[in-house]
């Protein structure tokens, strides 16, 4: 049974044993003017619940990323538990684009694999698809904690594991990652402009004034923004704790999230 995500993504189907030889053939067809210089491996993991349209959008984002940071892209599409024994299914694609900076053509390798239950053999296969002398970053999109748990040991060799808390929830980030400091939350990254704006506002006040008499801080959020809200609340708590330390003040405030977003733009602390 063809995997809907692999079926929807661009590329040509190949046998598992022919993936790397097919990649070499694709490069040969592009000619000598195609630049082949990768900086990293990017493994894009899709959970079984990701739609074909969502996968296509994330694949396009990964290709745009590769245009700035040349990489080998490996796409892993998980099958539902009911299809755990389904055979592996692969695709290969070489996406080329003009690079004005180099005045030539640059290409991105994309290897795609639909798989069932993770096994040691599957991990070994994926490892052979990676460029061994380059760092590996993992982007887990729509991957549940149960789906990623079998990959935890394998992820020890990865420099970064990134996911979106608003999609995967807190439980994903509570997994026992071998290198917790290498795990990043995309929801937190998206809030950088908000943190910068709040930081400028807070910088206009003395640290002691910010924490004096403060009883509570609540970050309210709309649907689908729980990850951003959690990251912002943690950042606020860190800032105010630092302010208390600088001013030698006592901070006795509660920090909470609220799923009932108030209307309009506002910032409230009591």
Identify the meaning behind each predicted range.
Residues 38, 213, 265-267:
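Residues at beta-strand starts and edge strands
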Residues 240, 245, 260-270:
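Long, compositionally biased intrinsically disordered terminal regions
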Residues 63-75, 130-137, 155-162, 237-253:
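Structural alpha-beta junctions
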Residues 75-85, 250-262:
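Short connector loops at secondary-structure junctions
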Residues 1-139:
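An N-terminal, globular interaction/scaffold subdomain
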Residues 48-50, 223-225, 263:
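Residues that cap or initiate secondary-structure elements
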Residues 108-209:
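Conserved, well-structured core segments that form the ligand-binding/active-site neighborhood
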Residues 191-257:
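ATP/pyrophosphate-binding catalytic subdomain of soluble kinases
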């Amino acid at each position: 049974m063809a995997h809907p995500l692999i079926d929807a993504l661009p590329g040509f189907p190949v046998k598992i044993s022919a993936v790397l030889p097919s990649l070499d053939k694709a490069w040969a067809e592009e000619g000598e003017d195609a630049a082949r210089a990768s900086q990293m491996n990017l493994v894009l993991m899709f959970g079984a619940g990701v739609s074909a349209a969502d996968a296509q959008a994330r694949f396009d984002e990964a290709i745009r990323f590769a245009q700035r940071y040349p990489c080998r892209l490996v796409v892993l599409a998980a099958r539902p538990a009911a299809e755990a024994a389904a055979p592996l299914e692969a695709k290969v694609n070489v996406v080329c684009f003009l690079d004005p900076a180099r005045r030539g053509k640059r290409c991105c390798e994309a290897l795609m694999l639909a798989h069932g239950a993770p096994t040691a053999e599957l991990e070994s296969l994926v490892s052979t698809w990676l460029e061994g002398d380059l760092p590996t970053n993992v982007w887990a999109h729509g991957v549940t904690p149960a789906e990623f748990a079998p990959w935890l040991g394998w992820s020890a060799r990865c420099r970064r594991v990134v996911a979106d808390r608003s999609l995967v929830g807190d439980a994903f980030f509570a997994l026992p990652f071998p290198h917790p400091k290498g795990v990043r939350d995309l929801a937190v990254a998206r809030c950088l402009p908000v943190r910068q704006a709040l930081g400028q506002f807070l910088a206009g006040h003395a640290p002691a004034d910010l924490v004096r008499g403060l009883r509570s801080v609540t970050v309210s959020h709309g649907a689908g923004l729980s990850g951003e809200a959690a990251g912002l609340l943690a950042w606020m708590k860190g800032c105010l704790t630092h302010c208390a330390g600088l001013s030698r003040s006592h901070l006795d405030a509660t920090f909470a999230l609220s799923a009932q977003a108030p209307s309009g733009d506002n910032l409230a602390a009591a």
